[in-house]
Swiss-Prot record:
Entry keywords, A to Z: Mitochondrion
UniProt-listed Gene3D superfamilies: 3.40.1350.10
Family (UniProt): Belongs to the RRG7 family.
Species for this entry: Vanderwaltozyma polyspora (strain ATCC 22028 / DSM 70294 / BCRC 21397 / CBS 2163 / NBRC 10782 / NRRL Y-8283 / UCD 57-17)
Chain's gene name: RRG7
GO molecular function, one term: nucleic acid binding
Signal peptide (UniProt feature, chain positions): none
Compartment(s): Mitochondrion
Protein name: Required for respiratory growth protein 7, mitochondrial
Length: 250
């Protein structure tokens, strides 16, 4: 059953505070809005907004270009904020999980156990993001394999493997083969379904479209991030919440 976030003294904020970059890009590039370059960049800005506002990703930068290695965006993901707010609600620090997991032959140490030992730095992750602004087609296994290759290029040291998560963003759902593939890879990968910004009567509806619709962690990521409350954070819509104090909890 989905919990009612209103029971935790939540204050709602308008989504428009994250629309500045989108609005500026659209206004500055009206003369090329029919081009694929415009549509691709618009989608990247849309993804940036959704990651910043809903997953608390910070320091986001566009790096797309001829030498991007298949990566369009990079950023920092400080999971501590999400964990601490979800811990107020779900009492996550009372749970016990295995110290080591194995997925596809790779040994994984869940971040949560490091938190219990006082190592809070393990919650500061890097993200690499690839955006596919497909209007109708779905991300293919070939494109997902290329993303895995891009991850390996950017994270070529063993110490980087559990500190960096790669994200694929597209407006459409994964195919069954795509889903099978991402769960078989030996890297932390998240698939995000983010819709396109709608153009209504020559005006872009940045307020009501371009939303994060689905969030899917592959098997590796689920083990790495287990008991940090990320899925629950999204399910309850707490990215719009003010839970800065235990006094807010009722």
């Amino acid at each position: 059953m989905m919990m009612n976030p209103r029971g935790f003294g939540i204050k709602r904020f308008k989504r428009s505070i994250n629309n500045d970059s989108l609005t500026k890009f659209i206004n500055d590039n009206r003369n090329i809005e029919s081009s694929t370059v415009f549509q691709g960049n618009l989608y990247e800005y849309t993804v940036m907004r959704e990651l910043e506002s809903k997953l608390n990703v910070i320091n986001m930068m566009k790096i797309g270009g001829s030498n991007d290695g298949g990566i369009d965006l990079v950023g920092d993901w400080p999971l501590r904020t999400i964990y601490e707010k979800m811990n107020l609600i779900l009492k996550l620090d009372g749970n016990k999980i295995p110290s080591i997991s194995k997925i596809n032959g790779r040994t994984i140490k869940p971040i949560y156990n490091s938190i219990l030992k006082g190592n809070l730095d393990t919650m500061d992750l890097k993200i690499l993001v690839q955006c596919k602004a497909f209007s109708s087609s779905k991300v293919s296994p070939k494109e997902l394999r290329e993303l895995v290759g891009a991850y390996s290029t950017h994270c070529n040291r063993p110490s980087d493997k559990n500190k960096t998560i790669v994200m694929m963003c597209s407006p459409n759902l994964l195919t069954s083969k795509g889903l099978e593939l991402i769960n078989s890879v030996k890297i932390p990968l998240i698939y995000l379904r983010v819709s396109l910004i709608k153009n209504l009567n020559k005006e872009y509806d940045i307020e009501n479209s371009g939303k994060l619709l689905n969030y899917y962690e592959n098997s590796y990521t689920s083990e790495l991030l287990q008991n940090l409350g990320v899925k629950e954070w999204l399910k309850l819509g707490l990215y719009n919440a003010d839970l800065n104090s235990r006094n807010n909890v009722k």
